[in-house]
């Protein structure tokens, strides 16, 4: 394993150390970025170190006090650029952020599309396995429908990951 990937894991673990996922067990947040890297490497066949590091770091700017300058200092321009492409502007209302994800999905780099695919796969799996306790079945279906809309802009990025995401999206009717 490359030292940069270990550095990204340690960095993300520190940044997310006080955060929990919304699942029933309130699992440590770091499980999510690790899951993305696992999906990319072991299911998508992705070995690109920049993509794997960006997957580990993908929520650091959006959900912690991490700055773009900090990521640049530790991880350089390419990884930081990928992270920025998949980072929502938390100053915007949630519905606007969701709309922009759909609108921008087809315009982001190939590397960012891979991270976005893995993010959607991880989130849908988590919702299926252990959804947030306060989510109704309608809310779960809405999330799956939104993931489908984002997925449409990610086509042509990685056949294996797209197939996994397609199969997960089809399960929305199980709610």
Predicted regions and their residues:
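Active-site helical microenvironments for divalent-metal-assisted chemistry
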Residues: 1-175
């Amino acid at each position: 394993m490359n030292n940069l990937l270990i550095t990204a894991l340690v960095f993300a673990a520190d940044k997310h150390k006080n955060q929990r996922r919304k699942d029933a067990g309130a699992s440590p947040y770091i499980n999510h970025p690790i899951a993305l890297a696992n999906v990319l490497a072991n299911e998508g066949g992705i070995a690109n170190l920049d993509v794997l590091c960006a997957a580990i770091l993908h929520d650091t700017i959006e959900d912690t006090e991490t700055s773009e300058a900090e990521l640049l200092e530790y991880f350089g321009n390419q990884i930081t650029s990928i992270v920025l492409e998949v980072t929502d502007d938390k100053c915007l209302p949630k519905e606007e952020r969701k709309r922009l994800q759909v609108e921008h999905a087809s315009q982001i780099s190939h590397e960012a599309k891979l991270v976005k695919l893995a993010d959607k796969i991880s989130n849908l799996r988590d919702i299926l396995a252990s959804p947030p306790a306060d989510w109704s079945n309608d809310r779960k279906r809405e999330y799956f429908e939104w993931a489908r809309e984002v997925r449409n802009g990610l086509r042509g990025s990685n056949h294996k990951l797209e197939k996994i995401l397609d199969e997960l999206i089809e399960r929305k009717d199980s709610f």
